[in-house]
Amino acid sequence: MWLLILFLILSLGWNDAAPPGQSRIIGGFNCEKNSQPWQVAVYHFNEPQCGGVLIHPSWVITAAHCYSVNYQVWLGRNNLLEDEPFAQHRLVSQSFPHPGFNLDIIKNHTRKPGNDYSNDLMLLHLKTPADITDGVKVIDLPTEEPKVGSTCLTSGWGSITPLKWEFPDDLQCVNIHLLSNEKCIKAYNDEVTDVMLCAGEMDGGKDICKGDSGGPLICDGVLQGITSWGSMPCGEPNKPSVYTKLIKFTSWMKKVMKENP
Protein backbone atom coordinates (compact mmCIF):
# COMPACT_ATOMS: atom_id res chain seq x y z
CA MET A 1 0.00 0.00 0.00
CA TRP A 2 2.80 2.45 0.85
CA LEU A 3 4.36 1.84 -2.57
CA LEU A 4 1.09 2.58 -4.35
CA ILE A 5 0.67 5.74 -2.28
CA LEU A 6 4.15 6.96 -3.20
CA PHE A 7 3.59 6.03 -6.83
CA LEU A 8 0.56 8.33 -6.81
CA ILE A 9 2.02 11.17 -4.76
CA LEU A 10 5.17 11.27 -6.88
CA SER A 11 2.95 12.82 -9.54
CA LEU A 12 0.88 15.22 -7.40
CA GLY A 13 1.40 18.97 -7.50
CA TRP A 14 3.42 21.27 -5.29
CA ASN A 15 1.61 22.70 -2.27
CA ASP A 16 4.30 23.82 0.18
CA ALA A 17 7.34 26.05 -0.04
CA ALA A 18 10.84 24.94 0.89
CA PRO A 19 12.42 26.58 3.93
CA PRO A 20 14.98 29.27 3.03
CA GLY A 21 18.48 27.97 2.33
CA GLN A 22 17.50 24.32 2.07
CA SER A 23 18.56 22.75 -1.23
CA ARG A 24 17.76 19.08 -1.52
CA ILE A 25 15.74 16.70 -3.75
CA ILE A 26 16.46 14.19 -0.96
CA GLY A 27 20.13 14.53 -0.07
CA GLY A 28 20.87 16.55 -3.20
CA PHE A 29 21.86 20.08 -4.20
CA ASN A 30 20.84 23.02 -6.37
CA CYS A 31 21.57 22.09 -9.98
CA GLU A 32 23.97 24.47 -11.68
CA LYS A 33 21.90 26.85 -13.81
CA ASN A 34 21.24 25.52 -17.32
CA SER A 35 23.15 22.30 -16.57
CA GLN A 36 20.00 20.25 -17.27
CA PRO A 37 18.64 22.04 -20.38
CA TRP A 38 16.45 19.05 -21.30
CA GLN A 39 14.61 19.14 -17.95
CA VAL A 40 10.90 19.88 -18.31
CA ALA A 41 8.29 20.90 -15.73
CA VAL A 42 4.95 19.30 -16.65
CA TYR A 43 1.87 21.15 -15.42
CA HIS A 44 -1.77 20.06 -15.06
CA PHE A 45 -3.64 23.29 -15.79
CA ASN A 46 -1.55 25.74 -13.72
CA GLU A 47 -0.22 23.30 -11.12
CA PRO A 48 3.17 21.57 -11.40
CA GLN A 49 2.55 17.84 -11.64
CA CYS A 50 5.61 15.96 -12.88
CA GLY A 51 9.01 16.23 -14.45
CA GLY A 52 9.78 15.44 -18.05
CA VAL A 53 12.59 15.30 -20.61
CA LEU A 54 12.89 17.03 -23.99
CA ILE A 55 14.04 14.42 -26.55
CA HIS A 56 13.01 16.34 -29.70
CA PRO A 57 11.97 19.97 -30.25
CA SER A 58 8.35 18.76 -30.45
CA TRP A 59 8.41 15.88 -27.98
CA VAL A 60 8.68 15.41 -24.21
CA ILE A 61 8.79 12.10 -22.38
CA THR A 62 7.42 11.65 -18.88
CA ALA A 63 5.88 8.87 -16.78
CA ALA A 64 2.60 7.30 -17.91
CA HIS A 65 1.28 7.54 -14.36
CA CYS A 66 1.38 11.34 -14.85
CA TYR A 67 -1.46 10.87 -17.35
CA SER A 68 -4.04 13.65 -17.12
CA VAL A 69 -5.64 16.32 -19.31
CA ASN A 70 -4.86 19.95 -20.12
CA TYR A 71 -1.10 19.60 -19.98
CA GLN A 72 1.28 22.48 -20.41
CA VAL A 73 5.03 22.50 -19.98
CA TRP A 74 7.84 24.84 -19.06
CA LEU A 75 11.26 24.42 -20.65
CA GLY A 76 14.53 26.09 -19.70
CA ARG A 77 13.51 26.70 -16.09
CA ASN A 78 15.78 26.58 -13.06
CA ASN A 79 13.57 28.50 -10.65
CA LEU A 80 9.83 27.98 -11.04
CA LEU A 81 8.90 31.37 -9.58
CA GLU A 82 11.35 33.75 -11.24
CA ASP A 83 11.31 35.26 -14.72
CA GLU A 84 14.22 33.60 -16.48
CA PRO A 85 15.76 34.46 -19.86
CA PHE A 86 15.70 30.92 -21.27
CA ALA A 87 12.22 29.94 -20.04
CA GLN A 88 9.75 28.77 -22.70
CA HIS A 89 6.09 27.89 -22.19
CA ARG A 90 4.43 25.34 -24.46
CA LEU A 91 1.00 23.73 -24.67
CA VAL A 92 0.60 20.01 -25.36
CA SER A 93 -1.48 18.92 -28.35
CA GLN A 94 -1.65 15.20 -27.58
CA SER A 95 -0.39 12.61 -25.11
CA PHE A 96 0.63 9.03 -25.86
CA PRO A 97 0.85 6.80 -22.78
CA HIS A 98 2.50 3.49 -23.57
CA PRO A 99 -0.26 1.01 -24.49
CA GLY A 100 1.24 -1.59 -22.17
CA PHE A 101 0.88 0.58 -19.07
CA ASN A 102 -2.13 -0.28 -16.90
CA LEU A 103 -3.90 3.08 -16.54
CA ASP A 104 -6.53 1.45 -14.33
CA ILE A 105 -3.97 1.58 -11.50
CA ILE A 106 -4.18 5.38 -11.64
CA LYS A 107 -7.86 5.75 -12.51
CA ASN A 108 -9.06 3.37 -9.80
CA HIS A 109 -6.33 4.18 -7.23
CA THR A 110 -5.96 0.46 -6.65
CA ARG A 111 -3.78 -2.37 -7.84
CA LYS A 112 -5.01 -5.89 -8.42
CA PRO A 113 -2.79 -8.91 -7.68
CA GLY A 114 -0.41 -9.48 -10.55
CA ASN A 115 -0.46 -5.87 -11.75
CA ASP A 116 2.81 -3.99 -11.89
CA TYR A 117 4.08 -0.63 -13.09
CA SER A 118 5.77 -1.85 -16.26
CA ASN A 119 5.80 0.45 -19.30
CA ASP A 120 5.49 3.62 -17.19
CA LEU A 121 6.26 5.95 -20.08
CA MET A 122 4.35 8.63 -21.98
CA LEU A 123 5.10 10.93 -24.92
CA LEU A 124 3.77 14.50 -25.00
CA HIS A 125 3.51 16.22 -28.40
CA LEU A 126 4.05 19.98 -28.14
CA LYS A 127 1.73 22.28 -30.11
CA THR A 128 4.70 24.50 -30.97
CA PRO A 129 8.26 23.16 -31.17
CA ALA A 130 10.75 24.32 -28.58
CA ASP A 131 13.37 26.86 -29.59
CA ILE A 132 16.76 25.24 -29.07
CA THR A 133 19.02 27.61 -27.12
CA ASP A 134 21.80 27.47 -24.53
CA GLY A 135 19.11 26.91 -21.89
CA VAL A 136 16.83 24.53 -23.82
CA LYS A 137 18.31 21.46 -25.50
CA VAL A 138 17.25 17.96 -26.44
CA ILE A 139 18.98 14.89 -25.08
CA ASP A 140 19.48 11.74 -27.14
CA LEU A 141 17.80 8.45 -26.38
CA PRO A 142 20.11 5.64 -25.24
CA THR A 143 21.73 3.26 -27.73
CA GLU A 144 23.37 0.87 -25.26
CA GLU A 145 22.37 -0.91 -22.07
CA PRO A 146 23.33 0.91 -18.87
CA LYS A 147 25.95 -0.71 -16.66
CA VAL A 148 25.32 -1.62 -13.04
CA GLY A 149 27.52 0.53 -10.83
CA SER A 150 27.29 3.56 -13.10
CA THR A 151 27.13 6.98 -11.48
CA CYS A 152 23.76 8.54 -12.27
CA LEU A 153 22.16 11.93 -11.81
CA THR A 154 18.47 12.54 -11.39
CA SER A 155 16.76 15.91 -11.08
CA GLY A 156 13.44 17.55 -10.32
CA TRP A 157 11.44 20.00 -8.25
CA GLY A 158 10.07 17.29 -5.95
CA SER A 159 9.93 17.36 -2.17
CA ILE A 160 13.20 17.97 -0.34
CA THR A 161 11.91 16.27 2.81
CA PRO A 162 10.86 12.61 3.00
CA LEU A 163 7.47 12.88 4.74
CA LYS A 164 6.36 16.47 5.28
CA TRP A 165 6.24 17.72 1.71
CA GLU A 166 8.36 20.82 1.17
CA PHE A 167 9.12 21.92 -2.38
CA PRO A 168 12.07 23.96 -3.63
CA ASP A 169 11.85 26.82 -6.08
CA ASP A 170 15.17 25.79 -7.67
CA LEU A 171 15.77 22.62 -9.67
CA GLN A 172 17.45 19.97 -7.52
CA CYS A 173 20.02 17.35 -8.55
CA VAL A 174 21.21 14.24 -6.74
CA ASN A 175 23.95 11.73 -7.59
CA ILE A 176 23.09 8.07 -7.08
CA HIS A 177 24.24 4.71 -8.45
CA LEU A 178 22.68 2.22 -10.82
CA LEU A 179 22.01 -1.00 -8.93
CA SER A 180 21.10 -4.48 -10.05
CA ASN A 181 17.38 -5.14 -10.37
CA GLU A 182 17.84 -7.87 -7.78
CA LYS A 183 18.41 -5.13 -5.17
CA CYS A 184 14.95 -3.68 -5.87
CA ILE A 185 13.33 -7.10 -6.12
CA LYS A 186 14.68 -7.88 -2.65
CA ALA A 187 13.55 -4.49 -1.33
CA TYR A 188 9.94 -4.69 -2.52
CA ASN A 189 7.16 -7.19 -2.75
CA ASP A 190 6.08 -5.37 -5.90
CA GLU A 191 7.32 -6.93 -9.09
CA VAL A 192 10.38 -5.35 -10.66
CA THR A 193 10.54 -6.29 -14.34
CA ASP A 194 13.14 -6.16 -17.10
CA VAL A 195 11.70 -2.87 -18.39
CA MET A 196 12.67 -1.15 -15.13
CA LEU A 197 15.94 0.11 -13.65
CA CYS A 198 16.93 0.14 -9.98
CA ALA A 199 18.93 3.13 -8.71
CA GLY A 200 19.74 4.82 -5.43
CA GLU A 201 22.00 4.42 -2.40
CA MET A 202 21.59 1.36 -0.19
CA ASP A 203 22.64 3.46 2.82
CA GLY A 204 19.70 5.79 2.13
CA GLY A 205 19.62 9.57 2.28
CA LYS A 206 19.66 10.23 -1.48
CA ASP A 207 16.51 9.68 -3.49
CA ILE A 208 13.68 11.05 -5.59
CA CYS A 209 10.47 12.04 -3.82
CA LYS A 210 6.99 13.49 -4.35
CA GLY A 211 6.84 15.58 -7.53
CA ASP A 212 9.89 14.03 -9.24
CA SER A 213 8.02 11.49 -11.40
CA GLY A 214 8.84 11.61 -15.09
CA GLY A 215 12.21 13.27 -14.59
CA PRO A 216 15.49 12.02 -16.07
CA LEU A 217 17.94 9.40 -14.85
CA ILE A 218 21.24 10.15 -16.58
CA CYS A 219 23.97 7.54 -16.09
CA ASP A 220 27.55 8.25 -17.20
CA GLY A 221 26.19 11.14 -19.25
CA VAL A 222 23.51 9.12 -21.06
CA LEU A 223 19.73 9.37 -20.53
CA GLN A 224 18.79 5.87 -19.38
CA GLY A 225 15.64 6.15 -17.28
CA ILE A 226 12.52 8.04 -16.28
CA THR A 227 11.54 8.33 -12.60
CA SER A 228 8.70 5.88 -11.88
CA TRP A 229 8.19 4.70 -8.28
CA GLY A 230 9.78 3.99 -4.91
CA SER A 231 9.19 3.72 -1.18
CA MET A 232 7.82 6.07 1.44
CA PRO A 233 9.37 7.73 3.38
CA CYS A 234 11.69 8.72 0.55
CA GLY A 235 15.39 7.97 0.95
CA GLU A 236 15.10 5.06 3.38
CA PRO A 237 18.06 2.63 3.68
CA ASN A 238 17.79 -0.51 1.52
CA LYS A 239 14.93 1.04 -0.47
CA PRO A 240 16.26 2.26 -3.82
CA SER A 241 13.83 3.69 -6.36
CA VAL A 242 12.64 2.30 -9.68
CA TYR A 243 12.90 3.93 -13.09
CA THR A 244 11.52 3.11 -16.53
CA LYS A 245 14.30 1.56 -18.66
CA LEU A 246 14.28 3.70 -21.79
CA ILE A 247 16.37 1.50 -24.06
CA LYS A 248 13.50 -1.01 -24.00
CA PHE A 249 11.20 1.60 -25.56
CA THR A 250 13.28 3.41 -28.20
CA SER A 251 11.54 1.67 -31.13
CA TRP A 252 8.08 2.52 -29.77
CA MET A 253 9.01 6.17 -29.14
CA LYS A 254 10.49 6.59 -32.62
CA LYS A 255 7.41 4.98 -34.18
CA VAL A 256 5.00 7.31 -32.35
CA MET A 257 7.02 10.39 -33.26
CA LYS A 258 7.28 9.36 -36.92
CA GLU A 259 3.53 8.70 -37.20
CA ASN A 260 2.61 12.00 -35.51
CA PRO A 261 4.85 14.68 -37.07
UniProtKB/Swiss-Prot annotation:
InterPro entries tied to this protein: Peptidase_S1_PA, Peptidase_S1_PA_chymotrypsin, Peptidase_S1A, Trypsin_dom, TRYPSIN_HIS, TRYPSIN_SER
Organism: Rattus norvegicus
Superkingdom, taxonomy of origin: Eukaryota
Record EC number: 3.4.21.35
Stated name of the protein: Prostatic glandular kallikrein-6
Lineage of the organism: Eukaryota, Metazoa, Chordata, Craniata, Vertebrata
S-S bridge residues: C31-C173, C50-C66, C152-C219, C184-C198, C209-C234
GO molecular function: serine-type endopeptidase activity
Gene transcribed to yield this protein: Klk6
UniProt keyword annotations, A-Z: Disulfide bond, Glycoprotein, Hydrolase, Protease, Serine protease, Signal, Zymogen
Family: Belongs to the peptidase S1 family. Kallikrein subfamily.
